[in-house]
Each structure stands twice: as C-alpha cells, then as structure tokens.
From Swiss-Prot:
Positions of the FMN hydroxy acid dehydrogenase domain: 1-380
Protein name: L-lactate dehydrogenase
Organism lineage: Bacteria, Pseudomonadati, Pseudomonadota, Gammaproteobacteria, Pseudomonadales
Residues forming the catalytic site: 275 (proton acceptor)
Residues bound to FMN: 106, 127, 155, 251, 306-330
Organism: Pseudomonas syringae pv. syringae (strain B728a)
Amino acid sequence: MIISSASDYRAAAKRKLPRFLFDYIDGGAYAEHTLRANGSDLADISLRQRVLKNVDNVSLETRLFGESLAMPIILSPVGLSGMYARRGEVQVARAAANKRIPFCLSTVSVCSIEEVASQSDQAIWFQLYVLKDRGFMKNALERAKAAGVTTLVFTVDMPTPGARYRDAHSGMSGPYAAPRRILQAMTKPDWALNVGLLGRPHDLGNISRYLGKATTLEDYVGWLANNFDPSISWKDLEWIREFWQGPMIIKGILDPQDARDALSFGADGIVVSNHGGRQLDGVLSTAKALPPIVQAVGSDLTVLADSGIRSGLDVVRMLALGAKGVLLGRSMAYALGADGQRGVENMLDIFAREMHVAMTLTGVTSIEQIDASILVKAVA
C-alpha cells in the first residue's frame, strides 16, 4: 500500500487491526458529530498564500516548557497503545526521541512508566487522570518522578467516561465482547502473532498491581469507570501542584473561564481539547474553542491544542489560531497500528514536510511568525 499522507495510515491500520481496536481509536461519543466537526472546522479555515517573501530558510524548531523541539508536535497519551503494535508505547517513545519531540505516556498504557522510560533515549511526559484512589495517583506521581518524567499532563475532562456506541458494536464492550474480540483477532493473523501472542503481557502496566488476579479488559475498564471522580474541584488538585515541581499541563479545556481558572491554579500550560470527540458529543470543535481561550489567557499560559489534526496544514492552522503546539493522537495510533515505530516516524516526516510547504507558501520562516495574519479570515 502506498503511504503518501497521514490519512493513508488510517486505511492501513483498518486493514491490519482487529475491528475492536480500530474502532476504539477511530470512533467518538454518541453520533460522533463533534468528532467530525473537529476535522471539518479545521479544513474550513483558509490559509493566506503569499509570494516573493524570501522563504529560503524555513525552520520548524521551537521551545516548549524548557525543551528544544524539532517541531511543535507532541505525541499524545493514547490508552492501550501497546495493543496496536508489540510493546507499542515503547515504539512510540523511540520514534519521538528519534524525531526530537515529546511523547506523553497514558495512565492506561500497556507498558509501564518504568518500561517506557528505560527504553527511550529522552525523558518522557506522563498523563494522569483524576481518580478517586488518591493513593494510586500519589504512587503514579512518585513513579513518574523516579523514572525521570519531565512534564505532567493532567486530564480533567473525564469525571465520567463518554458514551461510545461504536465500542458496543465492535466488541470493545457490550454483550459477548470477549469472544467477539477473539474471533476478530483470528481474521488478522499478522496482528494475532506479533501483538496478540508475542506482545504479551497485555495488562495495563501502571494499574495491574492494583487489580491482583483480575486481568481481563473488562476488569481494567471496570476499575477505571469506578475510579473516575465526578466530585473533583480545583481545590482538590492543590496537593498535586505542590507535589509536582516540574511543568504541569491541564488537558481538556474548552471554556475560557476554565482556562483562567487553570492559570489561577498555577498550571504551566493547558491543552484545548474535547478528547478527540470521545467525551461529550455536541461540544465545540477545538478549532472554534481555541481563539477565545487564547484571548482569555494571553501569553500568561502556554496553550496547546489537539483533536482533528490530520496533516501538517492542520498544525499550521492551529498555530495560526493561537496554539503554541499540538498533540497528535489518532494520527499516531493509525501509524503505529499500520507499521509500528517506522510508521510513526514516517508519519512525523509527512507532517514536517506539509508544515514546511504551508509555511513557505504563506510567507513565514519560523514557528514564531505563524499567527492569524496567515489566515484569510484575518484579512477579510
């Protein structure tokens, strides 16, 4: 199969992965309106092409949270990445290190913090959920510190899991889910051998010690569902800010007031995100939510964004809307599922080339020069 764009990896992953895994990453909440809007609203933003601007030296280099990056991209925390390729989180961490960008490990990763950190040539970031079990959270933070994690990404948009109907149809959840997953795996022999068999263990490395002999996917999902904490407030997070001395990013912000609250709380950054359309269907797309949030916090808070970013052009659009960097989730997972570490690295190369072209043709040569002036709407 010819891979010329990041979207090609979606088709390749669909061919290679069992349905329950592909639909888990590909799907969204309810009728998936927000999932689709994330992409379409970005695509509707027109770039302002310029000519004769001397764009001989275009650089994607930038700095975020004290780190020098090859481009303003972070590989997102994606749960169960170790099911998309053998020890998938390790492969993603290596790809990120080779491309000199950060990788953020999910709480619900197959590979543990310690395994991924020991296999990566650069320090990783770590994502943590708000959970009722404060002992687990404190232990996870201590483990992250010990493993050399530099940056904490705190996800706050999951006081309860979203309703993802596609998962019930695919076998990720619902009646007879386990036998359905087995039957699907049998139709994908390459995945069944390389990941299903040789990629063991398939437990969630950061959680398994809390579950004892309960090791099925349903056990993990049940533990998480029972531990999401709808009573949490900003005050409940003060101990985390005191405990974690490194950069702390709040992920899941869609409202300007919540962005202001994150600033008052002492966060170093936020991620404007609707969880890829996987939580509440009908909320604003990230592209529409981002500008008023940037206006609300100005330069006092580093604003990142995710959801709907499928190309280097989309990265440039998000930067023009005010983000300082973006997180890639689905694009990373598709590439990982299709071709492991090599796929992720090639996907990042594609994004970099697309960014380079977009910057060249809009007349900017550095990330710092990208702003609303390169958008047609800004000059209409």
